[in-house]
């Protein structure tokens, strides 16, 4: 009864008001399920290709009618009659039909939407929660949230070079209580910013984008907010950074806070930050093509903090494998739309796990009401999730889904808190 009888694509809007792709899978049993794909603002050079129309008369060239048409014709023709529960085959058929390294023929947005819709339909067909269908009986770890509360870089119109300043609540013994600590700190941060005369408008991911000039200012604001909210920095709540440094890397130099820095200079900067603030995680600390610098960064800080590859790895198992071989980074950011199928995403997570790298399930800056990544985080026992701040429904939807999952799991639910980072210096 899990035979696919129809696949439908449509153009919908993401949280930035840009078109994106939704796919619906219809099974013989009558089950109907849909999935919406996200879209990123700062993208890695090796990401799978998001197919856009380029017609300036529609949505300023950002329409996705070609991708939708590919779903309604080529992909539908390919998958109708297939068994939805054979996810590996479903994804392989689409990859082979596309025939390109970066899914530029059918579009990664078309392929991924169908991949996720089929998985969701199969879970409903089997009368299982999505996390249970994807992860089996052992899916029970709720993730520590990395909450992006101050925005800079490509996500904001201020002078901060680093893209994200995150709070990482690890206290409370449960996801719900840790989330509460993060939310309370977010609200206190708002009042701290207001008191100091800064704007409290929120950016794409629900964080604030105040007109701060220096990294130190942003970190000091976080420390103050954590403390004023009644929590202990470095005990209850840690700090995480996404430098997104490929965005300010040019001609072999990093243009950071109006200075030209080398890779070694950046490493010294991070050592100073880690020595001064309770920073537990640094994402894309160096540029995606600066592999020599990454080796040195990993050597310098790899046993102290989580060094996350996002643009560096683009959720691509081949690139992750190469990075592991070269002792680069110690953590992988997982974004479904960077690679473009559920199967390849699960492969990337597994590759991280068997090589003792942590995996962080992540949203994109252009999101939707779709909560697939919340279930994926629990399904894979990843232990960490990045899905924005404590405002904007497109971000909060994921947190609410995780609250539901934790409640459903009851006493079987595990929240690791600080132990999610046990391989680093904050081991209990």
From Swiss-Prot:
One of its GO terms (cellular component) is extracellular region. The keyword Magnesium applies. GO terms for molecular function: magnesium ion binding; phosphopyruvate hydratase activity. Binds a second Mg(2+) ion via substrate during catalysis. Its EC number is 4.2.1.11. Mg(2+) binds at residues 242, 283, 310. Keywords: Cytoplasm, Glycolysis, Lyase, Magnesium, Metal-binding, Secreted. It is found in: Cytoplasm; Secreted; Cell surface. Its main location: cytoplasm. It catalyses: (2R)-2-phosphoglycerate = phosphoenolpyruvate + H2O. The keyword NADP does not apply. This is Enolase. It comes from Sulfurihydrogenibium sp. (strain YO3AOP1).
């Amino acid at each position: 009864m899990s035979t696919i009888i129809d696949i439908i694509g449509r153009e919908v809007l993401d949280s930035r008001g840009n078109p994106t792709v939704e796919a619906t899978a219809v099974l013989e049993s009558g089950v109907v399920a849909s999935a919406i794909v996200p879209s990123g603002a700062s993208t890695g050079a090796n990401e799978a290709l998001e197919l856009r129309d380029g017609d300036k008369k529609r949505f300023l060239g950002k329409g996705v009618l070609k991708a939708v048409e590919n779903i309604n014709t080529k992909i539908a023709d390919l998958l109708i009659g297939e068994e939805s529960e054979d996810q590996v085959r479903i994804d392989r058929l689409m990859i082979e039909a596309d025939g390109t390294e970066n899914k530029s023929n059918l579009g990664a947005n078309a392929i991924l939407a169908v991949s996720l819709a089929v998985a969701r339909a199969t879970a409903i067909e089997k009368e299982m929660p999505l996390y249970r269908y994807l992860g089996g009986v052992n899916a029970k770890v709720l993730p520590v949230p990395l909450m992006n509360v101050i925005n800079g870089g490509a996500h904001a119109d201020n002078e901060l070079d680093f893209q994200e300043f995150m709070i990482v609540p690890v206290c409370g013994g449960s996801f719900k209580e840790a989330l509460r600590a993060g939310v309370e700190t977010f609200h206190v941060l708002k009042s701290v910013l207001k008191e100091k005369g800064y704007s409290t408008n929120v950016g794409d991911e629900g964080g604030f984008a105040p007109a701060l000039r220096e990294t130190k200012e942003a970190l000091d604001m976080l420390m103050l907010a954590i403390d004023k909210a009644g929590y202990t920095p470095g005990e209850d709540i840690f700090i995480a950074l996404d430098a997104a440094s490929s965005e300010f890397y040019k001609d072999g130099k990093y243009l950071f806070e109006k200075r030209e820095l080398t890779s070694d200079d950046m490493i010294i900067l991070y050592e100073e930050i880690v020595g001064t603030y309770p920073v537990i995680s640094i994402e894309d600390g160096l540029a995606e093509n600066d592999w020599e610098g990454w080796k040195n960064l990993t050597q310098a800080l790899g046993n102290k903090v989580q060094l996350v590859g996002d643009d560096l790895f683009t959720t691509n198992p081949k690139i992750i494998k190469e990075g592991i071989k070269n002792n680069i980074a110690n953590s992988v950011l997982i974004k479904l739309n960077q690679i473009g199928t559920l199967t390849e995403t699960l492969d990337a997570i597994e590759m991280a796990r068997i090589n003792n790298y942590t995996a962080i399930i992540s949203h994109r800056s252009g999101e939707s009401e779709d909560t697939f990544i919340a279930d994926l985080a629990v399904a894979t026992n990843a232990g960490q999730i990045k899905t924005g701040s404590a405002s904007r429904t497109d971000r909060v939807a994921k947190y609410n889904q995780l609250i539901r999952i934790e409640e459903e799991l009851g006493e079987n639910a595990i929240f690791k808190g600080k132990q999610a980072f046990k391989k680093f210096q904050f081991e209990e």
